[in-house]
């Protein structure tokens, strides 16, 4: 059976044009093709509208169809640093619409970590606060320093015309 480990990728195959291919050889292509298919379908259905897609599983070239979200992270200082380090690498790979879960997804964020993450994330194209069930509710109004968060959100709103023109 499948155990959820890397060895499982050797145990199942996909039929690609009549050829059986191991999943591990096309794993990231799956995410890219899902994004591409959705993008192309919406272009056909409503070509006059701009669309926005982002995925956490992707492949080189997928930047033509959407952005990339850096995946489930933790509410840890090391993960905000990791996000900052990944961003330029993703940019060099062609992914310009990039971002992480502001404040962290898993674990309980602190007010200080959330404010620092906001300061960083307000300059990233993908900007969202998203957390796992069972973690601290991390909507900005739940923290004491709502005014500091509000000031950062004002900066983000001021950047929206630029971000829209560059990324959408």
Residue positions per predicted region:
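Catalytic-domain carbohydrate-binding cleft regions of carbohydrate-active enzymes
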Residues: 1-168
